[in-house]
């Protein structure tokens, strides 16, 4: 079977959400208990996150609605007040969104012609004369661990630490070098690589964040972004090797990237400690003792149902075929590509659409031929493209603060949790300074332990997981902002985006 071109997936709804920052540095906020919209929040959370619904788009403007995560829309009334609810007419809640050269947005009510503005606390639509008070800075609300895809070159950005550069030449985003952390600070963005280096304005990777690593971001609906220096320079792929560098003359569209959440790639090991790999273009066999690109699988799982699709680096999905064989030749919507996943202490068993479990046959091939699973059908699973985790829960990111000695779960800026694999599904959590996570008798955590502890990770979706702590309880985001391990059951507060 010939390898297919890697098909770039369109951004998901969560990749297209934004926060809107007023001239005063505060966020447009959905206030459920006040039945109103304000701009008083200092950080980006669930109530400050808005989905853009685009009905018409041109180069410098678009007609949009803003929808909150609660399912209600931003509405401008005839008297200039701004509230939320459901549109009463086809134009109610529609805004003309204009993109300005400085990266700011303005939102003009389609019905009244008045601009959305804030006084730093309240939000209203009173004036038809444009001013600085009507400017809003868009901030992408997706998880900070991202990939950058060039729709012009059909390739992904990749950090090359051997030469300290970033190239836009990766056909498949399966390596950790394709992942970047997008830090937002003082209105600018810093692009951090998987080895914790930063892209600078002189096109090289440097070890420290500084003014030379700060970029302004142009944001468009549908997940498009461009990074620039604010002085006429823009980042875009250059030369025959597509070096990501600063320049002033990109060809039309070269500077735009699709910003998406970093996908999850895993490796799977049989009981004989051999990697599952795609061989002869399509057969899946547990034969390799060495990890190769054909041993990597993109983990695509619906968080609402325990069904899993595994996408091989050849562009196809694992599927059950004739004679119960598992072949990497499936397509996205085929029913034979959906497997039921069962977790057990960091390992998984996979159940095919015919109800049988996947196991390794005597010739090493992966087959769906077992009715009652046992240890031989368990597969060890490990992250293949993530040397660290960045966890985001219901109240913010997991991180440390100089004001608290305990790890918090409501931070705007995250800490990186270095992963030290111990056994399949079991990891040690290491803090940024090289110390380990330690747990107190109250189920709270400190980031300066001397000894490594075991944490069990189980995937709950394509980019969702739960963590079983050393005390036998699940990690939970508490409303107070303290990270706790005190939950016997998996609740919404135990689900972490990574």
Curated annotation (Swiss-Prot):
<comment type="similarity">
    <text>Belongs to the fascin family.</text>
</comment>
<dbReference type="GO" id="GO:0003779">
    <property type="term" value="F:actin binding"/>
</dbReference>
<comment type="function">
    <text>Acts as an actin bundling protein.</text>
</comment>
<dbReference type="GO" id="GO:0007286">
    <property type="term" value="P:spermatid development"/>
</dbReference>
<dbReference type="InterPro" id="IPR024703">
    <property type="entry name" value="Fascin_metazoans"/>
</dbReference>
<dbReference type="InterPro" id="IPR008999">
    <property type="entry name" value="Actin-crosslinking"/>
</dbReference>
<dbReference type="GO" id="GO:0051015">
    <property type="term" value="F:actin filament binding"/>
</dbReference>
<dbReference type="InterPro" id="IPR010431">
    <property type="entry name" value="Fascin"/>
</dbReference>
<dbReference type="GO" id="GO:0030674">
    <property type="term" value="F:protein-macromolecule adaptor activity"/>
</dbReference>
<keyword id="KW-0963">Cytoplasm</keyword>
<dbReference type="InterPro" id="IPR022768">
    <property type="entry name" value="Fascin-like_dom"/>
</dbReference>
<protein>
    <recommendedName>
        <fullName>Fascin-3</fullName>
    </recommendedName>
</protein>
<dbReference type="GO" id="GO:0030036">
    <property type="term" value="P:actin cytoskeleton organization"/>
</dbReference>
<keyword id="KW-0206">Cytoskeleton</keyword>
<dbReference type="GO" id="GO:0015629">
    <property type="term" value="C:actin cytoskeleton"/>
</dbReference>
<dbReference type="GO" id="GO:0007015">
    <property type="term" value="P:actin filament organization"/>
</dbReference>
<dbReference type="GO" id="GO:0005737">
    <property type="term" value="C:cytoplasm"/>
</dbReference>
<dbReference type="Pfam" id="PF06268">
    <property type="entry name" value="Fascin"/>
</dbReference>
<keyword id="KW-0009">Actin-binding</keyword>
């Amino acid at each position: 079977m010939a390898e297919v071109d890697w098909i770039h997936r369109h951004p998901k709804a969560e990749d297209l959400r934004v926060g809107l920052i007023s001239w005063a540095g505060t966020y447009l906020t959905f206030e459920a208990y006040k039945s109103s919209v304000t701009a008083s929040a200092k950080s980006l959370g669930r109530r400050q996150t808005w989905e853009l619904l685009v009905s018409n788009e041109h180069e410098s403007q678009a007609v949009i609605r803003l929808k909150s995560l609660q399912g209600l829309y931003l509405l401008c009334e005839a008297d200039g007040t701004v509230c939320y609810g459901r549109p009463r007419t086809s134009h109610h809640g529609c805004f003309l969104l204009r993109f300005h050269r400085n990266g700011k947005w303005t939102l003009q009510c389609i019905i009244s012609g008045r601009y959305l503005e804030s006084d730093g606390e309240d939000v209203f639509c009173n004036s038809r004369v444009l001013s600085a008070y009507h400017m809003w800075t868009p901030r992408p609300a997706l998880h900070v661990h991202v990939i950058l895809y060039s729709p012009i070159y059909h390739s992904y950005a990749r950090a090359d630490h051997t030469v300290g550069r970033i190239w836009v030449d990766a056909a498949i985003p399966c390596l950790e070098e394709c992942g970047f952390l997008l830090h937002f600070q003082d209105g600018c963005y810093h692009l951090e690589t998987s080895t914790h280096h930063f892209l600078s304005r002189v096109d090289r990777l440097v070890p420290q964040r500084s003014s030379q690593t700060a970029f302004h971001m142009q944001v468009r609906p549908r997940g498009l972004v461009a990074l620039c220096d604010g002085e006429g320079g823009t980042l875009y792929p250059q030369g025959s090797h597509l070096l990501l560098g600063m320049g002033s003359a990109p060809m039309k569209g070269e500077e735009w990237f699709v910003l998406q959440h970093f996908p999850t790639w895993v490796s799977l090991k049989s009981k004989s400690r051999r990697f599952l790999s795609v061989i002869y273009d399509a057969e899946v066999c547990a034969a390799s003792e060495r990890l190769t690109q054909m041993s990597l699988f993109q983990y695509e799982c619906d968080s609402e149902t325990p069904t899993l699709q595994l996408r091989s680096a050849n562009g196809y999905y694992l599927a059950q075929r004739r004679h119960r064989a598992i072949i990497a030749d499936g397509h996205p919507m085929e029913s034979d590509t959906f497997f039921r996943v069962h977790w057990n202490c960091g390992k998984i068993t996979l159940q095919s659409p015919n109800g049988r479990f996947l196991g390794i046959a005597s010739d090493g091939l992966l087959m769906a031929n077992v009715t009652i699973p046992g240890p031989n059908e368990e597969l060890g699973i490990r992250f293949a493209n993530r040397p660290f985790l960045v966890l985001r829960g219901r109240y913010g990111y997991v991180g440390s603060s100089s004001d608290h000695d305990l790890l918090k779960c409501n931070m705007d800026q995250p800490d990186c949790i270095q992963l030290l694999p111990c056994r399949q599904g079991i990891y040690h959590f290491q803090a940024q300074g090289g110390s380990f996570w330690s747990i107190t008798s109250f189920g709270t955590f400190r980031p300066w332990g001397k000894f490594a502890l075991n944490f069990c990770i189980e995937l709950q979706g394509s980019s969702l997981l739960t963590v079983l702590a050393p005390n036998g309880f699940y990690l939970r985001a508490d409303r107070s902002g303290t990270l706790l391990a005190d939950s016997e059951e998996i609740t919404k507060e135990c689900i972490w985006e990574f």
